[in-house]
Amino acid sequence: MNPEVRAAKVGDDEALLRAHQQVWKRKHILRYYYETWYKLIDEALLPGTIVEIASGIGNFSSRADRRKIIATDILCGQNVAVVTDAHYLPFSPGSISNFVMIDALHHMAKPMQVLARAAECLKPGGRFVMLESYMSPWASLVFKFHHEKSDYSYDIYNPLNHMPQIWYGNAAMSRLVFDRPERLPLIVESIKYLEFLSYPLCGGFTYRSLLPAPLLRSLHKLEVSPLFANRFLGLRMLAIMTKL
């Protein structure tokens, strides 16, 4: 485990966020992966207002080469502009051009409510760009060694019996939400599947890298091939949704 994360007090969410910020500053290979994903998100965004939902430590919104982003989160943070619950976004109907959400859907108690509220706030033709873990057949094996478990019994409409657990994440959430796109309040334009093996080997925010950074980068370049980047082997998904 990364020493910064080990030192964070269990149950202290603000301490864990600070630990993640320290890991981000120190761990070059972690920034490499996220910058790769940020570029894909950038390419999908439309001109106009950009709001990030559940921004965490705010790495996406703090990039200097980006248009201004309104970062929101349920906790205060260095780059957080609006402190709010994602289920009750405080924006006027039809006022936002883009919503972005990165690695947060699996923490949402009522993900359909979050999407419905975002749809209300989007302008016609506006986009919701989401990067999220994806429980492919391969991922179901990888996540057996991950601290966030998958629960396919979770009721995305009435989760009250699961409320204490959802804060720690449900890796199956993207499947529960996107496997039936006809239920979504937005139109799914595209889903791109990402990653295979190199990112887990880098350890993410929580664990130490298992391989040297140059080797991880080389492996990652191979993983962009459709041989690995597909719904059977992908570990992540980039979903682009639009409001009609």
Where are these regions (language model features)?
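Short catalytic micro-motifs in class I SAM-dependent methyltransferases
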Residues: 103-104
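Short alpha-helix
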Residues: 166-191
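A C-terminal cap/extension of S-adenosyl-L-methionine-dependent methyltransferases
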Residues: 186-244
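A conserved beta-strand element that flanks and buttresses the S-adenosyl-L-methionine
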Residues: 100
